Amino acid sequence: MLEKFSKWKGNRSNHTTPSHSLDESAIPKHVAIIMDGNGRWAKKKGLPRIAGHREGMKVINKIVRKAIDLKIEVLSLYAFSTENWKRPRTEVDYLLKLPERFLKLELPNLMEENVQVRIMGGLDTLPEHTAKAVTKAMEETKDNTGLILNFALNYGSRYEMVEAMKQVAKEVETGTLSSDAITEDVISRHLMTADLRDPDLLIRTSGEIRLSNFMLWQLAYSEFWFTDVLWPDFTEHHLTEAIAVYQKRARRYGGV
């Protein structure tokens, strides 16, 4: 574990790097990003925290376009966790308006780029305006066949796994599933990412080295890349750098 932690630290970045030459045949198909550091970015500039969230929303546009250019198949973004409800009410209210604003501005472009919008998380406890906006985006883009833009909104991985196990238990109770037939694949099929491949690469900004209850099951064999760069300062070059590092690694999935 200590050896791996050292490797993670060794792959952290705190500056923008020149464009890397990538192997187009080895682009990760699913990239997941924990977009962290908006509040710290704002604090460093003497601005309110919501200014950092507003700036961070602009970065999403750039990264989505770069993901399309790189032919990434799935981009999962951790937008709002189940723990984020503990933040100040004014900040929570602002955060939950951002999906509506983003989709209002970007939905025409996402349609033009053949992007399919998905949401994983508890929509039923979101404000009505937020739930309506994301539901509309999912409905309008459901037949698109390009990049899957998967927002984790009101999402927590432990909650996701508990709900999955409840569904499995119910199937066992009703006799539609034998307890002996419960496998990793069965559990995976009951997660919110049931029809998505697991992430190949996880990126986390802001220098924090933890998963923060994000896709704990799905990230079991993902490659991790951490950067000190705060999310509002994250650029297409950082995404390319992360992928370049990913391409140098040997994914053994527990083997030799």
Curated annotation (Swiss-Prot):
Organism in which the protein naturally occurs: Halalkalibacterium halodurans (strain ATCC BAA-125 / DSM 18197 / FERM 7344 / JCM 9153 / C-125)
Asked if Ion transport is a keyword of the record, the answer is no
From the broadest rank down, the organism's phylogenetic lineage runs: Bacteria, Bacillati, Bacillota, Bacilli, Bacillales
> What EC number(s) does the entry state?
2.5.1.-
Identify the catalytic residues: D36, N84 (proton acceptor)
Is Metal-binding a UniProt keyword of this protein? yes
Q: Which domain of life is it from?
A: Bacteria
Task: Please state the span of the N-terminal signal peptide per the UniProt entry.
Answer: none
- GO terms for MF: ditrans,polycis-undecaprenyl-diphosphate synthase [(2E,6E)-farnesyl-diphosphate specific] activity; magnesium ion binding; manganese ion binding
Q: Which UniProt keywords apply?
A: Magnesium, Metal-binding, Transferase
For Mg(2+), which residues are the binding ones?
Answer: D36, E223
Tell me one Pfam family matched here: Prenyltransf
Annotated region Disordered: where? 1-22
Q: Which family does it belong to?
A: Belongs to the UPP synthase family.
Q: Which cofactor is essential here?
A: Mg(2+)
Task: Cite the InterPro entries for this sequence.
Answer: UPP_synth-like (IPR001441), UPP_synth-like_CS (IPR018520), UPP_synth-like_sf (IPR036424)
Name of the protein described by the UniProt record: Isoprenyl transferase
According to its UniProt entry, the protein's GO biological process terms are: polyprenol biosynthetic process
What HAMAP family does the entry give? Answer: ISPT
Q: Which GO terms describe its cellular component?
A: cytosol
Q: What does this protein do?
A: Catalyzes the condensation of isopentenyl diphosphate (IPP) with allylic pyrophosphates generating different type of terpenoids.
**Subunit arrangement?**
Homodimer.
The UniProt annotation places substrate binding at: 37-41, 49, 53, 81-83, 85, 87, 204, 210-212
Record's cofactor remark? Binds 2 magnesium ions per subunit.
Gene encoding the protein:
uppS
